[in-house]
Each structure stands twice: as structure tokens, then as C-alpha cells.
Amino acid sequence: MKIIGLTGPTGAGKSILTATAQRLGFKVIDCDKVARQAVVKDSEGLKALVKVFGADILLENGELDRKALARKAFSSPDNTELLNKTLLPHITALVEKECDSEYVLLDAPTLIESGLNKKCDAVIGVLADREKRLHRICKRDNISIDDANLRINAGKPDEFFKENCTVLIYNNGDSAEITEKFAEILTEIKER
């Protein structure tokens, strides 16, 4: 089994690359989706978050109020670290159950922080200019520039990814160009 990690800061444009990985025979595990599974109503992950951030992160029906959690979790680097420390063990356990294919791509913003990078044969980091990231985050999450800035500021700097990734891809331009480069990298890794 070959496991490839795909990571990078929020808004860098990792998600456009997953279809390429699937086309090349990789099972793609979207760790953001797994994270949502980890905090469904009455889950251990959600209970852990409530213990740390308080019951006001819940909607009236007992489900997670994502915006309320985001306001608290991204208000400071300490709170972001607390979010990751609380939730990552739950996410990691779910991800490990999904790694059941010859070729696996873990699409994971917190791949390195979770320790999942240690299970990877290679870690590909996707980076992009801050302005591009702001635009993508606002559009994707339907939030203000101020809220997008909070999310970027709460995340790891580019240097973190430069130090911890095997390969870096810069996603500032043409999506066809980046997907072609990504396909070349994955093909090379598969052939090792």
C-alpha cells in the first residue's frame, strides 16, 4: 500500500487535485469530511469539543454550530491548537479505518499536526498567495474577508509546509497546469 499525503494551508486549492488522484487509481480520503463525521450529533468527538469549548457551540437540536465553533477556535492560535488537540485523535482513528486500498491519498489540512504524515510515503504540500487564498475562502465558505483572515492567521505559515513536505506545488495560476504537475508527481510516486 502507498499512502500519499496532500496538505497545505486553508484556501491553497488542495481540493481541485483530488479528481486527478482518483483518475490515477488512488482512493481519496477527504479528512475534512471525516472531521465532519467525527462531530456528528452525540459522537465522542462532539462531546469532547463541548467539554473544551462549551455547550454554546451546539445548535438547539444538539448538532454542532460550525460558525460558533469557528469563532471560538480561530480566535487565537492557542484555541486553534486546542481544537486540533481535541479533535485530531477522533479524526485519525476514522481515517485509519478508511486506508484499505493499494493507493491512498489523504487530503488533510492538518496532516502533519495529526501525525498522519508519518504513515505517508510522500507528503505533497500545496501553497498559494494570500490574496488567492482569501478569495477562495470567502467564496467557498461564504464568509467575510475579516473571517477569512482570521482563519488564515490561525493556520500554519508557509514555512511550516516548506519544512515538512516532501514536494511543494504552488497553486497561483492555471488549474490545468497544477493538475498536470500533480499527476506527474503521483505517477512518479506510484512507480517507485
Q: What name fits each language-model region?
A:
Residues 1-3:
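Pre-Walker A (Motif I) flank of P-loop NTPase domains
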Residues 6:
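Hydrophobic anchor at the beta1->P-loop junction of P-loop NTPases
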Residues 10:
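The conserved Walker
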Residues 15:
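Walker A/P-loop
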Residues 23-31, 44:
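Post-Walker A helix-loop "phosphate-sensing" segment adjacent to the P-loop in P-loop NTPases
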Residues 32, 83, 105, 148, ...:
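Residue-level signal for inorganic ion chemistry
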Residues 33-102:
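ATP-dependent small-molecule kinase phosphotransfer cores
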Residues 96-97, 101-103, 117-126, 131-143, ...:
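NTP-dependent small-molecule kinase module
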